[in-house]
Each structure stands twice: as structure tokens, then as C-alpha cells.
A protein has these predicted regions:
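N-terminal secretory/membrane targeting signals
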Residues: 1-28
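Glycine- and aromatic-enriched membrane alpha-helices
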Residues: 24-448
Length: 448
């Protein structure tokens, strides 16, 4: 715990030092953008049928990542007496987040009140109708596409507290967290006037917005809820690796909609994004398996599928800027670094991140967010021109990551404190944990 406290203190220091720099950059960029807008107003965009068709498909693919992709992946990793509880968590998060996105989330994330907060002008999709546009696609389609990201991000955190957290506490925590952590960070990075976007932060599909926030939130939850009974001496083995492999396959395919869909167009950029996404996942799979082979003498199926997800998480922020060489490098780095974080570092620090959300998504998202600064350069196969400054971009990426880490850390702690009071504690009783959450929380059994 002391080591964890030291790490968190260091991150807080980085954030406090670097926040003024990023805020100043955002202010200058916002003023410049306002001046341009005053000079000439852009004409209203017309609907592009090809782009609309692609984003409709991508929206379905990203929803497919959560139900059933992530649900099956997590369900296979837990014990037999908790398989339904994990499926229920992901399924209920999908339902609750969909309603919250309509009511509050979209407005907070994509309103234009300020560079730091979207405001309440679009509550319950106010002003959004079948005629309104977002670029050259219907705004309702953009609303739906972004809703799938709002769904999967809190669902990712489920893997950190499986088999021990109260169902009511889980629902309340993820609901508040999505609105006060995810939605504001989404606004900073992806809204047209968000201060991180204006400062030049690169994050096409959610290295910061999705993976770093989910990873840090997961770290806080698994520490505050506490480890599973018997951890770390007891052996917690996946009850169904075939389910894990099936879920991973769905995630891998769905990630094409996640990343390539974030280009919001059916064009060459989307095609390149799809290819580099696949290459990063493939490379990370190989590297993770090699690391296992060297350390344990055998490469496991679980290691291969976990490595692929690490590569997918890491390429998420970079997929719009890097070429195939950059994808191979980011995949290799994430495969090795995430393996170390999930296998070695977690054991040393002693926290029970049950399904390695921190090591795979948090660390993977950070790796990709930082490395994009290097591999976006044209000299390394990226899309940026000759005047691109790697050092300056790296500092921008580091600053945005640090701010997000500290913000997510602090808010997650506060939310969990409140949820613990409201729900009479965060975790189930020892007897309920022993019986398994399928029976104790839902009155059903996954296998009869």
C-alpha cells in the first residue's frame, strides 16, 4: 500500500506541475479558433450516405463489444458460481448507461458550455432531431455511436471487483462515475471546444477517455473494496477458457468499429486505422506469449487472449496517427509492459485486480497515449509532417494523461466513499461471497 501511495503522489505532482501549461495552450488555441470562426462561418454539411452507413455499422460493432464480447470474456475468467453475476453486471450497465447518456451524459460530454464542462444544454437530447447533423452524419447517429463508448468504459471496470462487490453498489458507483468522470474527460478530449483537444492532445478512440479512466477507476475500486477471500494464496482459475476466447474474438472484431469508426468517415484514414489496430493486437499477442514462454516454459491461451486486448487498448489512442511500423512497435511495447504490469507488478504491489483491468487497459492505454507522440512522426511512418515536434507532443500527451489520472483517482475515491455510505458497504458478506454471487445476489445458477 505504501508503494501504491508513493506512485499516486508522484502522479499528483506531475499533474499539478503540468496543468497550467496545458491550460495555457488550450486558452491560446481557443482564442485562435474563435478568431477564425468570426472571419468565416462554414456552410451546413450535407448528409454523406457512405459515412452514415459505416458509422451505423461501427455503432453496432462497439455495442457488440460489451454485449456479448466483454461479458463472455469476463464470464469465462471467473469461477463457475459467479458467471451469471458478471454477465448481469455488463448487461445492466448497458441498460443503465443508455438511459443516463440520453438524460445527462451526452450534454455533459458534447455540450459547448465551456472547454471544461459541456453544460446542460443538450439534456435528454434537447435540440437533437432527425434533421440535425454532426459533420456529415446525423447527430442522432453520433449520439448513438458515442453512447456505446459511454457503455463499455464502466463495464471494463467490472473485471477489477468481480466475485465480491454488492450489485447495488456496483450500479450506483458506475452510474455516478460515468457522469462525473467519463463524461467530463470525454468533453476535454473529444468535444470541439475541449481544452485537451485544443491543446493538441492525440487520442482518436479513447486511450485517455476510455482506457486510462477505466484503469484508474478499477485500481481505486479493487483497493477500496478489498481482495477476494483467500487472495493471494488461493488459486483463482478461469472456469471456461473457451468463453474467454469467444469473447476475445468478438472484442477484436468489434474494435474495428471502435477505432476505425472514430474516424467518422468511410475513407482511407478509416481503412488505415483498421489495419494498424489489427497489427497492434497481433504483435501484442505474440510478445505476451513469448514473455510467458520465457518465464514459465509454456505459452498459455489466457496469456494470448489477454495480450491481444492489451495491444488493442494501446493502439486505441494512436490508431489515427501511426502507420504499420508504429502499430508493430506499440503492439510489442504493450505486450511486454502490460504483461509485466499484470503478472509481476501486481503481485509486488498486492492489489487484487481480479481480471487485470489496470494492467491491460490502464497501462495499455497509457503506453499508447505516450508512444503516439513518437510514431506519429513521418520519419517513423506516421502522418505528421516535417515540422512536427516529437518532444512537444510527448509533453502534451504526458500532461493530459497525468491530469486524467489524478482527476479520475480523486473522483473515484469520493464516489466510492459516498456509495459505501448509501449502500451500507461496498462488498457482500463472507457467506454470500462463499456461496457465489450467482445464487446470493441473483438467485440463479449458471450451470445446472
Amino acid at each position: 500500500m505504501k508503494r501504491i501511495a508513493c506512485i499516486l503522489s508522484l502522479l499528483a505532482g506531475i499533474c499539478l506541475i503540468s496543468f497550467p501549461v496545458l491550460a495555457q495552450e488550450a486558452s491560446e488555441a481557443t482564442n485562435a479558433a474563435a478568431a477564425v470562426e468570426e472571419e468565416a462561418a462554414e456552410p451546413a454539411a450535407e448528409l454523406n450516405g457512405a459515412n452514415t452507413a459505416w458509422i451505423l455499422t461501427a455503432t453496432a460493432l462497439v455495442l457488440f463489444m460489451t454485449i456479448p464480447g466483454l461479458s463472455l470474456f469476463y464470464a469465462g475468467l471467473v469461477g463457475r458460481k459467479n458467471v451469471l453475476s458478471v454477465l448481469m453486471h455488463c448487461f445492466m450497465i448497458t441498460a443503465v448507461m443508455s438511459v443516463l447518456w440520453l438524460a445527462f451524459g451526452y450534454s455533459i460530454a458534447f455540450g459547448d458550455a465551456s472547454p471544461y464542462f459541456g453544460g446542460f444544454g443538450k439534456l435528454f437530447a434537447s435540440g437533437v432531431n432527425s434533421e440535425s447533423m454532426s459533420g456529415d452524419i446525423p447527430e442522432f447517429l453520433f449520439f448513438g455511436f458515442q453512447m456505446t463508448f459511454f457503455i463499455i468504459t464502466p463495464a471494463l471496470m467490472v473485471g477489477a471487483f468481480v466475485e465480491r462487490m454488492k450489485f447495488s453498489a456496483m450500479i450506483l458507483f458506475t452510474s455516478i462515475w460515468a457522469l462525473v468522470v467519463y463524461a467530463p474527460v470525454c468533453h476535454w478530449v473529444w468535444a470541439g471546444n475541449g481544452f485537451m483537444l485544443e491543446s493538441g492532445t492525440m487520442d482518436l478512440a479513447g486511450g485517455i477517455v476510455v482506457h486510462i479512466t477505466a484503469g484508474i477507476g478499477a485500481l481505486v475500486v479493487c483497493i477500496m473494496v478489498g481482495p477476494r477471500k483467500g487472495y493471494p494464496t488461493a488459486q483463482f482459475q478461469p472456469h471456461s477458457l473457451p468463453l474467454c476466447v469467444t469473447g476475445t474474438g468478438m472484442l477484436w472484431v468489434g474494435w474495428f468499429g471502435f477505432n476505425a469508426g472514430s474516424q467518422l468517415a468511410a475513407n482511407g484514414d478509416a481503412a488505415q486505422t483498421l489495419v494498424v489496430t489489427h497489427l497492434s493486437a497481433a504483435t501484442a499477442t505474440i510478445v505476451w506469449s513469448l514473455a510467458e514462454k520465457i518465464k514459465n516454459g509454456k505459452a498459455s491461451v489466457l496469456g494470448a487472449v489477454t495480450g491481444s486486448i492489451a495491444g488493442l487498448a494501446a493502439i486505441t489512442p494512436a490508431s489515427g496517427e501511426v502507420g504499420p511500423i508504429g502499430a508493430l512497435a506499440i503492439g510489442a511495447a504493450s505486450g511486454l509492459v502490460c504483461w509485466y504490469a499484470s503478472v509481476i507488478l501486481k503481485s509486488k504491489l498486492g492489489y487484487d485486480d481480479s481480471l487485470d483491468v489496470v494492467g491491460v487497459h490502464g497501462v495499455g492505454g497509457l503506453v499508447g497515449t505516450l508512444l503516439v507522440a513518437f510514431f506519429a512522426a513521418s520519419s517513423l511512418g506516421g502522418k505528421q509532417g516535417a515540422d512536427y515536434a516529437i518532444g512537444g507532443q510527448f509533453m502534451t500527451q504526458l500532461t493530459s494523461s497525468a491530469i486524467t489520472i489524478v482527476y479520475t483517482l480523486v473522483l473515484s475515491i469520493i464516489i466510492l466513499k459516498v456509495v459505501g455510505i448509501v449502500c451500507g458497504g461496498l462488498r457482500v458478506s463472507e457467506s454470500e461471497e462463499q456461496d457465489g454471487l450467482d445464487i446470493s445476489a441473483h438467485g440463479e445458477s449458471g450451470y445446472n
